[in-house]
UniProtKB/Swiss-Prot annotation:
<dbReference type="GO" id="GO:0000324">
    <property type="term" value="C:fungal-type vacuole"/>
</dbReference>
<comment type="function">
    <text>Involved in the transport of siderophore triacestylfusarinine C and so has a role in iron homeostasis.</text>
</comment>
<feature type="transmembrane region" description="Helical">
    <location>
        <begin position="318"/>
        <end position="335"/>
    </location>
</feature>
<feature type="transmembrane region" description="Helical">
    <location>
        <begin position="392"/>
        <end position="414"/>
    </location>
</feature>
<keyword id="KW-1133">Transmembrane helix</keyword>
<dbReference type="GO" id="GO:0005886">
    <property type="term" value="C:plasma membrane"/>
</dbReference>
<dbReference type="InterPro" id="IPR020846">
    <property type="entry name" value="MFS_dom"/>
</dbReference>
<dbReference type="GO" id="GO:0010008">
    <property type="term" value="C:endosome membrane"/>
</dbReference>
<dbReference type="GO" id="GO:0015891">
    <property type="term" value="P:siderophore transport"/>
</dbReference>
<keyword id="KW-0967">Endosome</keyword>
<feature type="transmembrane region" description="Helical">
    <location>
        <begin position="106"/>
        <end position="128"/>
    </location>
</feature>
<dbReference type="GO" id="GO:0055085">
    <property type="term" value="P:transmembrane transport"/>
</dbReference>
<feature type="transmembrane region" description="Helical">
    <location>
        <begin position="223"/>
        <end position="245"/>
    </location>
</feature>
<dbReference type="InterPro" id="IPR011701">
    <property type="entry name" value="MFS"/>
</dbReference>
<feature type="transmembrane region" description="Helical">
    <location>
        <begin position="421"/>
        <end position="438"/>
    </location>
</feature>
<feature type="transmembrane region" description="Helical">
    <location>
        <begin position="71"/>
        <end position="93"/>
    </location>
</feature>
<feature type="transmembrane region" description="Helical">
    <location>
        <begin position="191"/>
        <end position="213"/>
    </location>
</feature>
Length: 620
């Protein structure tokens, strides 16, 4: 065999790539002639996106030994441990912060705001990560995380705390998304669930540590410093993962393929900053994102503000944003369907059940959680007489169960190669959990039932939540993986925002009247409503005032759980609509051009159900 010199091989490869690109361009132009200008508009940043994805695949191949993979997973574990512990106790600190502002009922208002902002930021982070790379967006997210943490820690009113929470949550969801994408980039479909479950593992530790941390930190007086210290703890915990990504880039630097990719120019290099910004404006659908955020936010936030000690539905500050929201939503629909060049939720991707079914499930997962557990910490402390540490542990117990089961489930899935059966079984467990939450809502004997509910919830989360994420990734290509993953988390947080609004509306509209009814004293009811965690210090368990407070909480929590139970039904029905492709050793599905979803795989469970129905109908 005659060996071709290295330079000649490189030039031949480049020539072949050039010919291939020319042929693909001719095919694209031919197809574009038969398509409408808007529907088949060429994504001018597609070349840059493809370049980043090809680089990530080459980098992933360099971590091909079990030692390097173990180091990478451990680095991801350290990062997720840091933000997992922080987020598990920061929710508790928010309760104490609102209590210090005498605005405890506004927890749901802050939750709606941050969930909506963080939801749409997922789409932006997903789009930008394919253009600028995972590591760059990871670093940007860390900066936002730090800025938000500092603002929150120094806030002395609800408005400033909410502003800090927006920066913090945008940074948090950015970090979470980039970690998931890094793990996905470095795993085959068969091992995807195992890698995706890595962020849940820290809960094995944080569930038990978080309660002790909260108790030792004395958040009633020191919540500000307790938040501030994470501005330097979290970045330090991210260093190992950053070093792993840099090490991958260093190992791949001498590869011929990598050098060829380095020679390729991005859209920014060929067209300049101005054209790049214009394309990003359309690519990220900035107008659509703003219309969606403003419209839905204006509808949801007033729901959490209209109630309380006195009703505010006649106040123009409540009615104005509420009406504006309903005006903006049709504007958003018109923009996305008629004017947006690149809709942030592409219809071609959403129209297949392999995508819309998992997205629907993710909406209901966060919706049900926020409805049933949005005020659970306060319920445990006030109505069940739990300490701060035990209440924190109980809230995080479901994460602990998920983390314990996760490694075993991940390994089992690598052998079974399908996910749908786990998703269906996990979805059915939600009914048991909500039933327990309905039965055990108050009283010192309720803690056992709530703990049992959280344990079952954790098991269902492991079998249901994470396989659903992998399911939507497994039906599309690597190029669309970031898009569907970002959409997944976006819809997830929108579900939480909607639930927080409904939960807050129920809480603010119902709690004060019930407190007034059971206590019979307006001053006592107002104090108990505004700062319950301070109020119970002077009204210990067993006193008539505390008993009246418990009855009021029990009554309101009943409606919260009923709504969660009702919406568990459509969530379960959607499990039968997800696709069930085989999980292979590939990074993602290999699809022909202009195909977004793998539709040719069989679906054993749906096929079996269809045969049973056909057989039953035949007999009748």
């Amino acid at each position: 065999m005659i060996e071709v010199p290295e330079d000649n091989r490189s030039s031949q490869t480049k020539r072949k790539n050039t010919e291939k690109n020319c042929n693909e361009l001719m095919v694209d132009e031919k197809m574009d002639d038969d398509s409408s200008p808007r529907d088949e508009m060429k994504d001018k940043l597609k070349g840059t996106k493809s370049l980043i994805i090809r680089k990530s695949e080459l980098m992933a191949k360099k971590y091909d030994t079990w030692q390097l993979k173990a180091i990478f997973l451990f680095s991801a574990f350290i990062c997720t441990f840091a933000y997992g512990l922080d987020s598990s106790i920061r929710g508790t600190y928010m309760t104490y912060a609102m209590n210090s502002y005498s605005a405890h009922s506004l927890i749901s208002t802050v939750s709606v705001i941050v969930l909506m902002i963080s939801a749409v930021s997922q789409v932006i982070f997903g789009g930008l990560s394919d253009i600028f790379g995972r590591l760059t967006l990871f670093l940007v997210s860390i900066v936002l995380y730090i800025v938000g943490t500092i603002i929150q820690s120094q806030a002395y009113d609800v408005q400033r705390y909410a502003a800090g929470a927006v920066f913090y949550y945008v940074g948090l969801v950015g970090v979470m998304l980039q970690v998931v994408l890094m793990l996905s980039d470095n795993s085959s479909l068969k091992w995807r669930l195992f890698y995706t479950l890595i962020p849940s593992w820290p809960s094995i530790i944080t569930t038990w540590v978080s309660g002790s941390v909260v108790e030792a930190a004395n958040p009633l007086e020191n919540w500000s410093w307790n938040i501030a210290m994470w501005a330097f703890i979290f970045p330090l915990c991210c260093i190992p993962l950053i070093l792993c990504m840099l090490h991958m880039r260093w190992k791949v630097r001498n590869d011929v393929e990598w050098k060829e990719l380095q020679d390729e120019k991005s859209y920014y290099q060929t067209h300049g900053l101005v054209q790049m910004l214009v394309q990003l404006f359309w690519k990220l659908d900035v107008v659509g994102v703003l219309l969606f955020t403003a419209g839905v936010g204006c509808i949801l936030v007033p729901l959490t503000l209209a109630g309380g000690v006195s009703t505010n539905w006649r106040n123009s500050k409540i009615i104005g944003p509420f009406v504006l929201g309903f005006v903006l939503v049709p504007g958003f629909i018109y923009w996305e369907s008629r004017l947006a060049l690149v809709p942030f939720a592409p219809f071609k991707l959403l129209k297949d059940r392999g995508v819309w079914a998992p997205l629907g499930i993710m909406f209901f997962i966060c919706f049900v959680y926020q409805m049933a557990a949005g005020y659970l910490y306060t319920i445990l402390v006030v109505a069940v007489d739990e300490s701060a540490s035990s209440a924190t542990r109980i809230i995080n117990l479901y994460s602990f169960v998920t983390a314990v089961v996760a490694p075993f489930l991940g390994l089992i899935v690598t052998r079974s190669s399908r996910l749908k059966s786990y998703i269906i079984f996990g979805g059915s467990l939600y009914f048991i959990t909500m039933g327990l939450f309905y039965r055990y809502r108050s009283g010192q004997d309720a803690d056992g039932g709530i703990i049992a509910g959280m344990v079952i919830w954790g098991l269902s989360s492991c079998l249901f939540d994470y396989p659903t994420i992998v399911s939507i990734q497994s039906v599309t290509s690597h190029e669309n993986m970031a898009t569907v993953t970002a959409l997944n988390y976006t819809v997830f947080r929108i579900g939480g925002a909607v639930a927080a609004a409904i939960s807050g509306a129920i809480w603010t509209q119902s709690l004060y009247p019930k407190l007034l009814h059971y206590m019979g004293d307006a001053d006592l009811a107002t104090a108990a409503y505004g700062s319950p965690l301070t109020f119970i210090l002077s009204n210990p368990w067993g006193t008539p005032v505390r008993s009246a407070m418990v009855e009021a909480y029990r009554h309101v929590q009943k409606y919260e759980v009923i709504v969660a139970l009702v919406f568990s039904a459509p969530m379960f029905l959607l499990t039968f609509c997800v696709r069930d492709p085989r999980l292979t050793e590939d990074f993602a599905q290999k699809l022909p051009d202009r195909e977004y979803v793998q539709t040719k795989e069989d679906d054993p469970i749906n096929d079996w159900i269809a045969k049973r129905f056909a057989k039953a109908l035949g007999r009748s």
